[in-house]
């Protein structure tokens, strides 16, 4: 007993003499305790959502009622292939408890993902549920609208990406704080509870390309900030400081040479007889009983608004400008029955310290993909369509991020006109309205 007491008494001296080891093992102990705390908290969250989901599964229905069929399309490469494991923990059990029929299909590559998204229809499922991040969403939306004029199924999204920028823009109150699994569970509950919203895709075409147009819901971006955010992943060993270190390290090595481009854009219009075609109304089919009931009524199957008589003199008006900066961002803004384009270019004449300063502000507020300072963007306008031609793009940032999918390093991006336009291509999506569980 005296030996044990003696060792305890010498412990402070031992720790003092081995400062480096003490600091190292203390840090490991902190990380271990934090992991245990987060694991226990997430287990409790999953349990509470399971209690809600099982109530739907225990609801009495007719034997003839077919269960809701969900076709789960998984990008196995999403977020270093970790998103599928998280889906299995957070969303799949809720579907099973709610009595939902689930079919899971894994796509091995982007081409397969696009093909499957375009092929699935009401014969196989009632709902398409996509597991992946921003790039996966862009690929799925492209697959749907390259193969069909209209989407056949409503779509749900599991936030399996590294940043999930589009979901954060659509519903920041749910997806901005992703320290726990509540936001992931809510996406499954939105499908179970049939919480739907209509969104509209953008269309992107490239001059001289033989490929069909690309479609997406998120944004198109390029620049120093986007490149630095992309490289931060390799600094994982800096843990919570990896973003700040990425900004400091990249600006220590090189200065932010500007992007230069020429922009042509078309004035935005909420709808007029010039830009909105008159709705196509199919002639009704006659049946013998119409002799007794009268002439059948014409029906607008799409429920489209008729803009005949509405005149907007600025509709289709085109403008041109030359702009330059450290970051440009093109966002798909959702309107009532269409989407429009928001073009922003910022960081004009910004230096190394300016990039670090603005980057640190983004880190402090947990924002990725855009500046927290609205004055940062010297060029900012809304348009029906935007056509831009990049004349200067530094070699280190020679990439265009389309729905967070980066173009290859050897892609021809300069002196080629790229056109992005808002569309009326509608997609019904499942989106939670709020986080129901308070911690």
UniProtKB/Swiss-Prot annotation:
GO molecular function per UniProt: acylglycerol kinase activity; ATP-dependent diacylglycerol kinase activity; ceramide kinase activity; D-erythro-sphingosine kinase activity
Pfam families, A to Z: DAGK_cat (PF00781)
GO cellular component, one term: cytoplasm
Boundaries of every DAGKc domain copy: 65-208
InterPro entries registered for this protein in UniProt: ATP-NAD_kinase_N, Diacylglycerol_kinase_cat_dom, Lipid_Phosphate_FormReg, NAD/diacylglycerol_kinase_sf
GO BP annotations listed: ceramide biosynthetic process; sphingosine biosynthetic process
The name this protein goes by in its record: Uncharacterized protein F52C9.3
Lineage: Eukaryota, Metazoa, Ecdysozoa, Nematoda, Chromadorea
């Amino acid at each position: 007993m005296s030996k044990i007491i003696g060792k305890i008494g010498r412990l402070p001296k031992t720790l003092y003499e081995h400062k480096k080891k003490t600091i190292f093992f203390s840090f490991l102990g902190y990380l271990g305790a934090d992991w245990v705390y987060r694991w226990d908290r997430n287990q409790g969250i999953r349990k509470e959502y399971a209690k809600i989901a099982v109530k739907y599964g225990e609801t009495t229905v007719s034997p003839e009622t077919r269960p809701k069929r969900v076709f789960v399309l998984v990008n196995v490469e999403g977020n270093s292939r970790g998103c599928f494991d998280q889906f299995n923990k957070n969303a799949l059990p809720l579907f099973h408890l709610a009595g939902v029929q689930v079919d899971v299909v894994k796509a091995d590559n982007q081409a397969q993902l696009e093909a499957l998204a375009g092929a699935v229809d009401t014969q196989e499922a009632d709902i398409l549920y996509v597991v992946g991040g921003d790039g996966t969403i862009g690929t799925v939306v492209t697959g749907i609208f390259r193969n069909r004029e209209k989407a056949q199924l409503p779509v749900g999204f599991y936030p399996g990406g590294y940043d999930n920028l589009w979901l954060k823009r659509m519903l920041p109150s749910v997806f901005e704080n992703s320290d726990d699994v509540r936001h992931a569970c809510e996406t499954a509950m939105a499908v179970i509870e049939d919480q739907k919203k209509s969104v509209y895709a953008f269309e992107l075409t490239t001059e001289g390309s033989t490929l069909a147009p690309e479609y997406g819901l998120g944004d198109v971006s390029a620049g120093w900030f986007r490149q630095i955010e992309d490289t931060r992943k390799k600094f994982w060993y800096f843990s919570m400081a990896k973003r700040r270190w990425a900004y400091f390290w990249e600006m220590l090595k090189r200065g932010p040479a500007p992007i230069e481009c020429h922009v042509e854009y078309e004035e935005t219009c909420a709808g007029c007889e010039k830009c909105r075609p008159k709705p196509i109304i199919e002639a009704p089919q006659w049946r013998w009983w119409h002799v007794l009931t009268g002439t059948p009524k014409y029906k607008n199957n799409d429920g489209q608004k008729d803009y005949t008589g509405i005149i907007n003199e600025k509709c289709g008006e085109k403008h041109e400008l030359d702009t330059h900066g450290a970051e440009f961002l093109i966002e798909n803004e959702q309107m009532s029955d269409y989407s429009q384009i928001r073009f922003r270019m910022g960081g004009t004449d910004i230096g190394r310290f300016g990039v670090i300063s603005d980057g640190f502000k983004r880190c402090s507020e947990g924002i990725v993909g855009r500046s927290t300072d609205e004055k940062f963007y010297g060029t900012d306008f809304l348009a029906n369509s935007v056509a831009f031609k990049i004349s200067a793009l530094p070699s280190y940032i020679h990439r265009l991020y389309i729905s967070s999918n980066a173009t290859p390093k050897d892609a021809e991006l300069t002196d080629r006109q790229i056109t992005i336009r808002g569309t009326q291509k509608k997609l019904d999506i499942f989106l939670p309205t709020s986080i129901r569980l308070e911690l």
